[in-house]
Every structure is written in structure tokens, then in C-alpha cells.
Amino acid sequence: MYGRRKGIPDGIGGEMAAIEVHGIGTKEDPWQLKTPSGTGEYQMYQDEAADPPALVCTVGTTVLRYQLRCLDDLHEMLRKHADWMLLGSADEQKPAAEGTVEAWGRSAENPVGGWYGLKKGLRGRFGMYVPPLMEALGLAEVEHNPKNNRIRAI
């Protein structure tokens, strides 16, 4: 489990996280998260048995899957960036704004050489759904404004 791998106890939240989060990141007890603007709710859990291991995101009835390694890779990129970065969320069919987390999550220059999203047609919105989990895990700080939110590594 990601939490144990990083030394973060199950049931993250409270002092370990920058935001209050419920759930432990399993299919049976997923993390309950909110979008950076606070207007949308969704769930995430890690599926380490998947090939490749996946971060499963459920938004209403839509299920998105991202490579689980995106958490470590994004944290490392943000540490090297050493400043705030715009999230820039966009659907797969729309271009991502240059220099955003969304653009990095689909760039040929990232560690996986392209999309972290695993299901064609549902590979976007990386910049919307992954950063709040990064914040909950204590890996990043995320702004919570109505729009144009940013992230930086902790």
C-alpha cells in the first residue's frame, strides 16, 4: 500500500495530512477526497494487483485509472521544480496548458514517456484528481481557490 510504503499510517488525516481525509486507500475503504476548488467529491484507492499497479479514481459513475507510480513521479518532479505549478486540468480530448501538472501527466518527457492515465478516452483530468491525494498523503501543498489552483512539493 502506498501509505505503508511511504511510512504514512493507514487512516491518513489529522496531523499527517494538510487536509482532513477519510478512508485508507483500499477498495473497501477508499480515500474520500474533494477537488481543489472544493466543489466536487470523489474516491480513490490503490490497486497494486493491477498490471501496472493503478490508482483508481471514481467520480460519480465514471472510473478513471492512473499508474500508481504517478504519486512518486509527480512528487519528484515537483521537488525539482521547487516552486508552485498550475494544475491545469483538462479532458483527454482537449490540449493541456503548457507548464501545468496536466501537461506533465501526458508528456513524452515524463518518466513513463506519455499518459499516466490508463484507459483511452478517460486519461485526462490528472491535474484535477491526483494533486488532492498528494496533499492528503503529506507530499504536496495544493491551493483551494475557485480556479487556477497550484501545487508545490513538501
Residue ranges and their predicted role:
Residues 145-154:
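Short, cationic-aromatic polyanion-contact patches
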Residues 93-112:
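Short acidic, glycine/tyrosine-flanked loop/strand segments centered on an H-E-D-like triad
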Residues 135-145:
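A short, conserved structural fragment
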Residues 107-125:
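Short helix-coil junctions and helix-kink-helix linkers
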Residues 3-15:
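Short, Lys/Arg-enriched N-terminal segments with co-localized hydrophobic residues
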Residues 19-90:
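Long, low-complexity, charged/polar intrinsically disordered regions in eukaryotic proteins
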Residues 121-136:
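Short amphipathic alpha-helical interaction segments
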